[in-house]
């Protein structure tokens, strides 16, 4: 008897790394995630960054050609079933938005630029889901432009860092002439150890039960060690030291001939070995296992585990609110009105059903006063700074940018020329959220326990109207009336109309 599975669906995750782009496709069957295929293309994106931190046309073109190939596999996929994360190089690139806009022409799915801390958390999640459970794990991932180091238990990362040292940028800095020498290795190792100085003692003190390495650099080291006769593939400091001695037997990177070392990994292999050697020494790692799981697997598992994802963001916002002594009762009232107002004008704003901007508005409402912990004067700017620069687990860079802009424009004059540019979201939608949040804040400005009568918000282009079934509602709320008149003037200054 054959059982027909009706609830299977395919999901895909893409990792836009500094050295290579990776795609993994999986099938979700009931509660099981079955990997179907992996795809990898070396694009050397980091090599295209010039001195002004702009990507050159050649590297952009290499990236677009790879994404066009990925697009063939993803034909018919719904946007909710594809997640694309960009890492270090696109974090650094000043023209990242240009690349993302051109990428949308060949691969019509949103690209998220994720902070280093979020990259580290997702890497840990990918390893944790694909390895036997240990009481605690250290995970190290050496990418093209950055290295992530995470200690956690179960599926939760507890200590994480992302350092700007990768196999591509360290190759350019310490092996630029293609020469292999003890001097070049020593310089690269010392530079790596300097990057680790501020965090190494924390990692040693916290400790871990098992160490895992993920992604291309550590995979290559693992396979070369097997080729050297270490059948268990374990990485140790002693084996790394001997590997460096072995590499110095060649004068040039181009001449390297090692079993297990592929041609595409060869140019950046020496720098990767140097970085990992420094990490072993600085963190006092005894041995490391290789893990197939990494960032893209973390993206996959988080896509399917949506409740866990929501819990992470809820925990992040709650912790940030507690840290900055936010008045949660007041914030909840603002959040409630923001939710109601947005539901009333969402169609006019053109917001698609289920848009994540609805969630971001609620998070923004909860956190709009975090800046009060710094100073009452200009607290909206302080709030914006905190939300832009904090490590916020569960949020990518652009989501944090939305929160920051909501905080920045929650009150006072609307200097819209200071509004940031977005690649994942339309600016008109962000402006709509700003209007909604401002009104939710104004109607709760009295900060008292007297309930407001039910309010109705409607919008037609730049004319918005706030109404109440009780005709004399503002007669009984003189202070609110004055606040609305002040808000009305702020709107008038930018060509908007607020009626009430």
UniProtKB/Swiss-Prot annotation:
This protein's superkingdom?
Bacteria
**Source organism lineage?**
Bacteria, Pseudomonadati, Pseudomonadota, Gammaproteobacteria, Vibrionales
Q: Which GO terms describe its cellular component?
A: plasma membrane
Q: What is its main location?
A: membrane
Q: Which Pfam families match?
A: Ppx-GppA, Ppx-GppA_III
Task: Read off the InterPro entries from this record.
Answer: ATPase_NBD, Exopolyphosphatase, GppA/Ppx_hydrolase, Ppx_GppA_C, Ppx_GppA_N, PyroPPase_GppA_Ppx
* Cofactor requirements of the protein: Mg(2+)
Keywords linked to the UniProt accession: Cell membrane, Hydrolase, Magnesium, Membrane
EC number(s) per UniProt?
3.6.1.11
Q: What reaction gets catalysed by this protein? A: [phosphate](n) + H2O = [phosphate](n-1) + phosphate + H(+)
CDD domains per the UniProt record, alphabetical: ASKHA_NBD_EcPPX-like
Q: What is this protein called?
A: Exopolyphosphatase
Which species is this UniProt entry from?
Vibrio cholerae serotype O1 (strain ATCC 39315 / El Tor Inaba N16961)
Q: How does it sit in the membrane?
A: Peripheral membrane protein
The record's PANTHER family line, in alphabetical order, gives:
EXOPOLYPHOSPHATASE
BP term (GO), one: polyphosphate catabolic process
């Amino acid at each position: 008897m054959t059982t027909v599975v009706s609830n299977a669906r395919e999901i895909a995750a893409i990792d836009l790394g500094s050295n290579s782009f990776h795609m993994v496709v999986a099938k979700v069957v009931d509660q099981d995630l079955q990997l179907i295929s992996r795809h990898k293309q070396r694009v050397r994106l980091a090599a295209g960054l010039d001195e002004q931190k702009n990507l050159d046309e050649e590297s952009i073109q290499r990236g677009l050609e790879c994404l066009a190939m990925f697009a063939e596999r993803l034909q018919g996929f719904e946007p909710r079933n594809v997640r694309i994360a960009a890492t270090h190089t696109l974090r650094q690139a000043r023209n990242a938005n240009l690349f993302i806009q051109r990428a949308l022409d060949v691969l019509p799915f949103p690209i998220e630029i994720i902070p280093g801390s979020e990259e580290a958390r997702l890497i840990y999640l990918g390893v944790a889901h694909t390895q036997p459970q240990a009481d605690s794990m250290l995970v190290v991932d050496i990418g093209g432009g950055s290295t992530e180091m995470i200690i956690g238990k179960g599926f939760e990362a507890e200590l994480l860092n992302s350092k700007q040292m990768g196999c591509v940028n360290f190759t350019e800095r310490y092996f630029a002439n293609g020469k292999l020498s003890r001097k070049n290795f020593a310089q690269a190792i010392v530079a790596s150890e300097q990057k680790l100085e501020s965090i190494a003692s924390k990692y040693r003190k916290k400790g871990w039960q098992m160490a895992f390495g993920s992604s291309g650099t550590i995979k290559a080291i693992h396979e070369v060690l097997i080729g050297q006769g270490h059948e268990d593939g374990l990485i140790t400091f002693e084996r790394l030291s001997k590997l460096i001695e072995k590499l110095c037997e060649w004068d040039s990177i181009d001449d390297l001939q090692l079993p297990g070392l592929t041609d595409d990994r060869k140019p950046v292999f020496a720098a990767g070995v140097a970085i990992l050697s420094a990490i072993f020494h600085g963190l006092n790692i005894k041995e490391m296992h290789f893990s197939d799981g990494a960032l893209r697997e973390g993206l996959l598992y988080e896509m399917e585990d949506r409740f866990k994802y929501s819990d992470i963001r809820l925990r992040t916002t709650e912790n940030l609110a507690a840290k900055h002594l936010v008045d949660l009762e007041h914030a909840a009232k603002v959040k409630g009105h923001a939710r109601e107002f947005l539901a009333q004008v969402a169609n006019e704003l053109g917001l698609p059903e289920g848009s994540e901007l609805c969630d971001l508005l609620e998070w923004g409402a909860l956190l709009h006063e975090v800046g009060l912990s710094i100073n009452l004067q200009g607290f909206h700017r302080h709030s914006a700074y905190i939300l832009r620069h904090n490590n916020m687990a569960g949020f990518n860079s652009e989501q944090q940018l939305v929160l920051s802009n909501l905080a920045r424009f929650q009150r006072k004059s609307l200097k819209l020329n200071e509004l940031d540019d977005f690649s994942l979201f339309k600016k008109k939608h962000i402006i709509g959220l700003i209007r909604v949040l401002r009104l939710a804040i104004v109607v709760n400005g009295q900060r008292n326990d007297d309930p407001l009568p039910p309010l109705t918000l409607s919008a037609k282009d730049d004319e918005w109207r706030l109404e109440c079934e009780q005709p004399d509602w503002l007669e009984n709320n003189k202070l609110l009336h004055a606040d609305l008149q002040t808000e009305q003037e702020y709107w008038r200054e930018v060509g908007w109309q607020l009626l009430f």
